[in-house]
Amino acid sequence: MTELNIDCLNLIFNELRKDKETLYSCLLVNKRWCLLVVPILWEKHTWNFYHDEAEKKTIDGIITKFFKDKKFKDDKRKLLEQEIYKLFVNECKNIKEMDLYTSQPLSLFQGASTFFYNVKKLSITINCILPNTLHEMAKFCIYLNELIIHNCSQYNSGLISLIDSQKNLKIVSIYPDSKAGTCKELGKVLGRKGNTINDLSLYSINIIPLISLVNLKNLLIYNFELYDINSIEIKRFRQYLENSKFSNLQILDVYGLSCFKELATLIKNTEENLLEISIITKYVNTNNLEIFINSIANNCPKVRDLSIGITSKEFILIKSILLNCRNLICIEFDSICYENDIIGDEILNYLIDYSPKSLNKLILSGNWKYSIDIFKRFLESCRNHKLILFGITYEIFITDDHVEIARKYVNEGVIDEFKILYPSHTSHSYI
């Protein structure tokens, strides 16, 4: 049977340029056809947001229908997957971001050294990758700026090798496996990259020992497991916090932890460089909260964004924060315990008397009571320094009268926006 030459095939495929379904079917004829069709299909990437939804669904549907077809056996499915990855690795020379979520041995494919050499941001799902893949990648994937690790387990020698090989690793995010324990070796290898890493996100307190990174500027710690205050994990993490020193730290974001004494020590050791502090915790032991708030007031003169919880015992310390932290742009004060409903007016009075002129965003708890007179007096004081946003989380004690007063000041241009906010600030009403 006579085969069409390349020129003829190119003419035919170009005529079919708008018929994506036919072009996708041509991918499966043979390798020669596949090599000619791919450049045409990839002239516009499927992730280009200018594509309309109908076109995106068509493209995605065609390329995945072979994998979902019951008649398409597993061995053929794996073979097709492998050929697609081979083509991808060999032909794409300037990929900067990569999400590695496959058991295919990509590091062994032709062109892998060039492909991975140029990758700057890599996201890997550990339990989906062959053990030797990361070892092989460590030979040529050495210029990552950002590494995101999913399903991190107790120990993975390939991951250790990959991190050890990096020349300029700056950002690391670690998400744990549900059964993972502490991986000391991972902590050690990150410590060896302390001169370059400036952004660390830990989505569990039980993944690695918290190491001191000399150039760390951003630190995020999420206790999603919500370990009990007396658990071994919390006690161990308290020690890590107390012994850690991040003198260049600028952003501290902590969720689900109430280690206030240790956090106070950490803040003291930042040498007054903190610009953003967010400590979110609810229904927990508030021991040492006063020490923590005092540490902010005494050691954070440059802080611009502040989000913390308080109780009726500590609200008086707000004055010292407002007096000492004169660069504040955004403040969020939340109620840790619901018995604090009486302190709303006192907080507003402190804000009236001591707010820095730089303040333009304010979010307060709706679990506190605000008298109409003080609420109005506070908004009147905003004529001296305009608020871009005034928000109330929840609205337990916010009445229609409060809303009407706020609307009046929005209409007069004293504040740009008033919002009732809900958990995570993802759902809100506008005025």
Which residue stretches match the model-derived regions?
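Leucine-rich repeat
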Residues: 9-11, 39, 60-87, 89-97, 102-121, 128-136, 139-146, ...
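Alpha-helical scaffold segments of alpha-solenoid architecture
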Residues: 220, 245-255, 261-262, 268-293, ...
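Leucine-rich solenoid repeat modules
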Residues: 295-300, 305, 310-431
